[in-house]
Design a protein with these regions (language model features):
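Alpha-helical structural motif
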Residues: 7, 25, 75-78, 204
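Boundary at the C-terminal end of the N-terminal hydrophobic targeting segment
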Residues: 20-23
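Aromatic-lined, polymer-binding surfaces characteristic
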Residues: 38-42, 46-59, 80-230
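N-terminal secretory signal peptides that target proteins for export/translocation
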Residues: 1-3
Length: 230
């Protein structure tokens, strides 16, 4: 199951039911989005292990296979592997951050891993909830991404793929973000302009909905909802 798509639909539902609430309707929408984002969609540990393997440990080029990795709570062994590969400088030692290929673009794995770890960090039911090692990794990972500015020859990564993962990560750790961390992230997410057609239109609407949740912009969230259902 596509966790981000489910979270998007949950946000739309909460938006329609919370519009008349005087106590910050976007707080409810935002929390609903995070609650659904951090869920694991694997029925048991065996399925989780299979999902991770089938996704080639987050390296799959196929969008559906990649979603297997980000839709579960990573097994403890995989979490420890990622912690072990992570350099104090904010990057993973097995990723080529200078890669610019159109398809299996290596730097995207950086955000895929951060998203998967943020799920565990933000979920109160996870054994890794609030873990200092993961928390430090997430902030260092953001700083490295902002400074390195990886880029692909494929427009999709810059306008859709990167903003999609980054926005979800920022929402899951929103309460811990510094002003500069949020501002730099928003500059990247703003590359997602409304438009295009088909699934790309839906993805762009989702990215703008997340941007609205990050900035408390109810008008933008409503516009994204209208783009989604229009």
């Amino acid at each position: 199951m596509n966790g981000l798509r489910t979270a998007f639909l949950a946000a739309l539902l909460f938006l329609t039911t919370a519009r008349a609430c005087p106590a910050g309707p976007l707080d409810r929408v935002r929390q609903a989005f995070v609650d659904v984002s951090v869920m694991s969609y694997a029925p048991d540990g065996e399925a989780t292990e299979r999902f991770v393997r089938y996704s080639d440990y987050g390296r799959a080029n196929d969008v559906l296979l990649l979603q297997l990795y980000t839709s579960v709570h990573l097994p403890d062994g995989e979490v420890r592997r990622l912690l072990g590969l992570f350099d104090a400088g904010g990057f993973w030692s097995d990723i080529d951050y200078d890669d610019r290929t159109r398809g299996r673009w290596q730097p995207s794995l950086h955000l895929t891993r951060m998203y998967a770890l943020a799920k565990l960090y933000a979920d109160p039911a996870s054994a890794w909830h609030g873990d200092g090692r993961i928390g430090g990794l997430l902030h260092k990972g953001l700083a490295y991404w902002y400074a390195k500015k990886p880029s692909s020859l494929n427009w999709w990564h810059g306008e859709i793929g990167v903003p999609k993962k980054l926005a979800a990560i920022l929402l899951m750790i929103r309460g811990e973000l510094s002003g500069p961390e949020l501002e730099q992230g928003l500059r990247i997410i703003e590359r997602s302009r409304f438009g295009r057609t088909g699934q790309n239109k839906v993805w762009l609407a989702g990215n703008n909905l997340m941007r609205g949740l990050l900035t408390d912009d109810e008008a933008l969230v409503a516009q994204a909802r209208d783009q989604k259902i229009g």
